[in-house]
Amino acid sequence: MSNNANVAAAIKEVAHKVFGGYAELLRMPHTARFSIGSVIACMPFPMVGMTITISVQHYYGNYSLAGVLTAIQAIALAVSSPLLGKLVDKFGQRQVSIPTILVWIVAAIALTTSITNRAPVWVLYCLTPFLAAIPPWGAMSRARWTTMLKGDRERTDRALSLSGVFDECMWIIGNPLASTLAVISGLLAFSFTGVCVVIGALMFLTELTTEPKSQTQLAREAGLTREEYREREAAKAQRMRERDAA
């Protein structure tokens, strides 16, 4: 019995050392909601490509078409992600995310309907790029952590590490889940992904207390133009780097 108790105590101690810091962060007010919400809303990243591949092959019997459409969505995502990130910095998280989500939902419904009805291939080519209209949930979550924990470098690093863990979990779960659902039904896979987007977005975007101000808001409060504000912040960051290097 004593050996079992010692083993249990050792396991508990190790678990506390590994996960205790993460649990402390998630116990902070409002943090669990936006952190978990961002992971749920990110499900299109691992799921859409796999869903397109399996669904198109099923309805069109063409792996080449499936591969091309998946590549189009991936390229569009690579182009749109940094652009959306810049828009979020400029205008704010909710102001950019809400219209972006609406575009994604409409595109997902249109593409699902087109695939299941075996629409002409050119229709799929036109609709697929719009599935890259995904807000940068991970970056927005990290921005919230950084704002909340400003000045506390240790906990900020831990929070960013936690965000990375959540991202990895999303990919580990999303790909096999998309494969399973798409084999059953492409409509089911797209529907599940859409539900994740809506639930995750509601959890994240309705948490207003942790939303950082946009550059436009901060510049207005400082009585500066956005360009002047960015230059001032860049100069501050440069001074901090020089101080840390000294």
Annotated model-derived regions:
Residues 13-78, 238, 245:
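Helix-loop boundary and gating motifs at the non-cytosolic
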Residues 130-169:
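Cytoplasmic helix-loop-helix junction between adjacent transmembrane helices
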Residues 190-206:
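Symmetry-related core transmembrane helices of the 12-TM Major Facilitator Superfamily/SLC fold
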Residues 80-93, 182:
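Helix-to-loop junctions at the C-terminal end of transmembrane segments
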Residues 102-118:
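C-terminal ends and interior cores of transmembrane alpha-helices
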